[in-house]
């Protein structure tokens, strides 16, 4: 696909914090739009991977608006929890994505697996997939991760 300059870009999220973070990383000459401008609800994320869920969002929002859309899916994988919460990370925070609630659940689940987990370094990683789509066509999709531990 030939490279073309992007003048307008839709950020495929209803999370205002995420929108602000992504916007701060992009060139100032790109006209940024949010899903809230179009009163769009998020699609059902029924993919099995971060990449699949990212693509579901970018294609959905692009088709709804006719704009090129950048969307992400990200989460925490914890080895002791069989890579959970994984693609369900946001759901661990409850209906409103409460970070403190999600962390409490992580600690609770770790304690169920190993009561002494706090004395150990539990391998974990943050995974993020980003995709750009135009209508129903994927332009690009990448994924990366940052390895670390919970202690």
How would you describe each model-predicted region?
Residues 2-10, 16-151:
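Anionic-ligand binding patches
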């Amino acid at each position: 696909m030939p490279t073309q300059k992007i003048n307008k870009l839709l950020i495929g999220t209803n999370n205002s914090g995420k929108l602000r973070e992504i916007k701060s990383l992009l060139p100032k000459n790109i006209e940024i739009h949010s899903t809230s401008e179009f009163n769009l609800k998020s699609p059902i994320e029924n993919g099995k991977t971060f990449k699949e869920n990212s693509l579901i969002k970018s294609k959905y929002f692009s088709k709804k608006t006719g704009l090129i859309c950048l969307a992400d899916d990200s989460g925490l994988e914890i080895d002791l929890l069989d890579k959970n919460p994984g693609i369900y990370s946001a759901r661990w925070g409850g209906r409103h994505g409460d970070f403190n609630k999600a962390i409490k659940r992580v600690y609770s689940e770790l304690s169920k697996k190993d009561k002494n987990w706090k004395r150990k370094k539990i391998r974990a990683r943050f995974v993020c997939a980003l995709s750009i789509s135009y209508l129903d066509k994927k332009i690009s999709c990448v994924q990366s991760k940052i390895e670390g531990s919970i202690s």
